[in-house]
């Protein structure tokens, strides 16, 4: 007859719980880095859109001596904002500015693009985050040094290019 110790070759409940705990800790440490890497790739697509938009607004301004009133009149056929972003054109006719806000993301931030012919901060693209949202600020810091005044209570901005 075989002994009792020869039959039990599995893991105990405590050993399984320790393994699950270790996997959970590793996943918690890796998840923010994964989310940041995904956001960086999404911003890459948004930056390409921003540059194309900026160049198109510049061409429109050179041809008509004014900013476009709608993105529909631009020469590059921008029909949709990049996936995961919401485009706002409220200042397009007055400043030629494009605002893209990240929607439903792990943290909040926006990209502001100004054409080269703009009298205010010409040709710049900024990453903007609320000072109340630490994750958005950390994400914008990935792109460069803070460019806003530390006394500005609402917005934190970083010059992307």
PLM segments and residue spans:
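Periplasmic/extracellular, small/polar-rich flexible segments of pilin-like filament-forming proteins
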Residues: 64-161
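N-terminal hydrophobic targeting signals that begin at the initiator methionine
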Residues: 1-2
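Alpha-helix termini
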Residues: 23, 37-40, 77-78, 95
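Alpha-helical protein-protein interaction elements
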Residues: 26, 52-53, 135, 147
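Generic detector of bulky aromatic hydrophobic side chains
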Residues: 10, 47-50, 54, 84-87, ...
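Conserved hydrophobic/amphipathic alpha-helical signal-anchor segments
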Residues: 28, 32, 36-74
């Amino acid at each position: 007859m075989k002994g009792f110790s020869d039959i039990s070759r599995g893991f105990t409940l405590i050993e399984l719980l320790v393994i699950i705990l270790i996997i959970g800790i590793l996943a918690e440490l890796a998840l923010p880095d994964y989310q940041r890497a995904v956001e960086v790739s999404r911003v890459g697509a948004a930056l390409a859109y921003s540059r194309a938009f900026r160049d198109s607004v510049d061409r429109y301004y050179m041809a008509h001596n004014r900013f476009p009133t709608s993105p529909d009149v631009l020469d590059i056929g921008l029909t949709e904002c990049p996936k995961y972003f919401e485009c706002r054109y409220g200042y397009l006719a007055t400043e030629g500015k494009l605002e893209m806000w990240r929607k439903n993301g792990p943290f909040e931030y926006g990209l502001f693009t100004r054409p080269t012919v703009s009298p205010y901060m010409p040709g710049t693209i900024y990453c903007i985050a609320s000072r109340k949202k630490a994750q958005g600020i950390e994400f914008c810091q990935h792109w460069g040094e803070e460019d806003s005044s530390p006394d500005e209570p609402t917005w934190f901005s970083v010059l992307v290019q």
